């Protein structure tokens, strides 16, 4: 009897702990396997929770592969209402504003959320002798670089699963698209994978036999709100006819919110009724149809979508982009003390930055149109990832993560060695030395003939304006001389330029008197000329000797004593005469002070001889 005894183990607050665990997993983003897109923003969730809370989602998820992360696009559903519904399904309660309550209830009824709506299907009104829908005609097609899927609106609500192989030799890679409509809202949209180089190639879409019409959905890649348009259903008839919509009636302008889409149908709207039709597409019997330029122009106005491609693996791949993972990790979530008030942060609802114009959806009847797409990841001309749905305005963590990822992707150039180059503020070119020397030689008024004096060491010094200059350097045909004056260890900075014949001032001004004597110079001076004649006496001395010879010839007849006396007087007169009589500019010695000293010394020597 002891073996038959059983113990009852009870977990207190099991339901609360279980729902709290689901909500915590949602807040952290753990094990999420489905994304719900509404108004260009994405809400991540778990298939299990959605299937338990809604027969609509249960039927949808059982028809799609379970090892992939599905993305469901919901038309005619606001992002705020979807967010509140997710909160209600995970927590069991939600706070909704009064003005948003009608949209919330209508969305819950369309999605068949338990606890908010009656899940019993609405009775279908009988149709008047409508022929039963025939089996769909399956047409195999191959997906090229550019794939266009055109479908026309259908009167009855349904959803379709379509699996397409890419035909590139990879057996493991396939593309699955699921189109769901819960009402009879007639719509016409297009799915296209854009590539400019193959814009002319398009694939004929599946065509059903008489009694059925096809539906299509659009996966946009540009961030614009879905345009809502009113559809005009026609009166019902005995048979369902295929309606052809013209370009002018069926084109939806993404920039004009007042555009209405006209479509002609013959079936009555039946909400909450779902008809499943499956079509298998193979890549072996694909047919490519070349369309004329006129047909291409007619279809340019239709909307085109690019399905995302993700790798299919045996096990679910929950790895996300590093930018999204970093953004989810850094997000902060607010939790109250009571579990019923727990809410998750808006970081889970990201906006599609790269999303295009969403398809216009029908608002009548409270219907909802959803699209689920699963694709294979490949390197194409345009790469698509989950980061394209990131809302930079709402989620700061994801934005910072994306910025860090893009910064790491950009390569930093290597740092160069050596001293960094400094920018020169003055970009004007400096004049060259030769140009300066040539400009100095243009001053003819201040120039003088070149006169040199020999030195005791065999060198020469230039005489200019009574000052002596020593040779400094030579540039081309020009020689530069610097003043020889030196006092207290400081040299005079005056320099002159000589072109071998004349001397020109170059730079600087004298701040000293002329030198009284220079022991290094000899009394002989010379000027460079063609004959190279060197004069040992100065012009003043030559004039003095000429005057004395004339006086001696005139007084030869007089006595020697008187002659000597007269010579002495003549010498004095002749010595004073050059000072009184002005001489020509060419005969005047520039160094007058030195000549005076020399004349006095010469007079003293003559007196000693006598």
From Swiss-Prot:
Keyword Phosphoprotein assigned to the entry: answer is yes
Locate the region Interaction with Chi.
Answer: 1-308
Question: Which GO molecular function annotation, any one, does this entry have?
Answer: protein homodimerization activity
Polar residues bias locations: 222-238, 386-400
Q: Where is the composition biased (Basic and acidic residues)?
A: 312-325, 422-432, 578-595
Q: Where is the composition biased (Acidic residues)?
A: 567-577
Q: Which residues form a coiled coil?
A: none
Q: In its keyword annotation, does this UniProt entry include Cytoplasm?
A: no
Composition bias, Low complexity: 136-156, 401-410
Residue ranges occupied by any BTB domain in the UniProt entry: 32-98
Q: Which PANTHER family does this chain map to?
A: BTB DOMAIN TRANSCRIPTION FACTOR, MODIFIER OF MDG4
* The protein, known as: Modifier of mdg4
Gene source species: Drosophila melanogaster (Fruit fly)
Lineage summary: Eukaryota, Metazoa, Ecdysozoa, Arthropoda, Hexapoda
């Amino acid at each position: 009897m002891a073996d038959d005894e059983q113990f009852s183990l009870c977990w207190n607050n099991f339901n609360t702990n279980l729902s709290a665990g689901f909500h915590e997993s949602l807040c952290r983003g753990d094990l999420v396997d489905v994304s719900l897109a509404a108004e260009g923003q994405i809400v991540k969730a778990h298939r299990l929770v959605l299937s338990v809370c809604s027969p609509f989602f249960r039927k949808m998820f059982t028809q799609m592969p379970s090892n992939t992360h599905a993305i469901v696009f919901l038309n005619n559903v606001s992002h705020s209402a979807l967010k509140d519904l997710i909160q209600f399904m995970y927590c069991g309660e939600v706070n909704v504003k009064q003005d948003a309550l009608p949209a919330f209830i209508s969305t819950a009824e369309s999605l068949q959320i338990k606890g908010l709506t009656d899940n019993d299907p609405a009775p279908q009104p009988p149709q008047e002798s409508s022929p039963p829908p025939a089996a769909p005609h399956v047409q195999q097609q191959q997906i090229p670089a550019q794939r266009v899927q055109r479908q026309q609106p259908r009167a009855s609500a349904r959803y379709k699963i379509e699996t397409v192989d890419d035909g590139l030799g990879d057996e493991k890679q396939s593309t699955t698209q699921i189109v769901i409509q819960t009402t009879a809202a007639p719509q016409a949209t297009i799915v296209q994978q854009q590539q400019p180089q193959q814009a002319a190639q398009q694939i004929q879409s599946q065509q059903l036999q008489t009694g059925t019409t096809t539906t299509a959905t659009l996966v946009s890649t540009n961030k614009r709100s879905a345009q809502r348009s009113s559809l005009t259903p026609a009166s019902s008839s005995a048979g369902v006819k295929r309606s052809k919509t013209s370009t002018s009636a069926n084109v939806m302008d993404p920039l004009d919110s007042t555009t209405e889409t006209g479509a002609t149908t013959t079936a009555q709207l039946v909400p909450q009724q779902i008809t499943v039709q499956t079509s298998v597409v193979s890549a072996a019997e694909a047919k490519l149809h070349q369309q004329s330029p006129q047909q291409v122009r007619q279809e340019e106005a239709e909307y085109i979508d690019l399905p995302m491609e993700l790798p299919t693996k045996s096990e679910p791949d929950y790895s996300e982009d590093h930018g999204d993972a970093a953004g989810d990790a850094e997000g902060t979530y607010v939790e109250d003390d009571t579990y019923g008030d727990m809410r998750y942060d808006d970081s889970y609802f990201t906006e599609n930055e790269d999303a295009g114009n969403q398809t216009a959806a029908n608002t009548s009847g409270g219907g909802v149109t959803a699209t689920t797409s699963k694709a294979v990841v490949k390197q194409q001309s345009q790469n698509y990832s989950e980061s394209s749905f990131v809302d930079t305005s709402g989620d700061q963590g994801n934005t910072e993560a994306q910025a860090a990822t893009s910064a790491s992707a950009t390569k930093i150039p290597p740092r160069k060695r050596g001293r960094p180059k400094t920018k020169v503020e003055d970009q004007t070119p400096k004049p060259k030395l030769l140009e300066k020397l040539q400009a100095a030689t243009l001053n003819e008024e201040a120039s003088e003939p070149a006169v040199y004096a020999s030195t005791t060491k065999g060198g020469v010094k230039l005489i200019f304006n009574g000052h002596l200059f020593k040779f400094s350097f030579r540039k081309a045909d020009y020689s530069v001389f610097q003043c020889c004056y030196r006092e207290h260890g400081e040299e005079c900075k005056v320099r002159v330029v000589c072109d071998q014949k004349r001397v020109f001032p170059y730079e600087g001004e004298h701040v000293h008197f002329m030198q009284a004597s220079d022991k290094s110079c000899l009394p002989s001076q010379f000027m460079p000329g063609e004959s190279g004649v060197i004069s040992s006496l100065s012009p003043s001395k030559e004039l003095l000797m000429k005057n004395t010879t004339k006086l001696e010839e005139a007084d030869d007849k007089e006595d020697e004593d008187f002659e000597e006396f007269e010579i002495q007087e003549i010498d004095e007169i002749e010595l004073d005469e050059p000072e009184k009589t002005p001489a020509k500019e060419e005969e005047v010695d520039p160094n007058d002070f030195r000549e005076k000293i020399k004349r006095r010394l010469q007079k003293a020597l003559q007196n000693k001889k006598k």
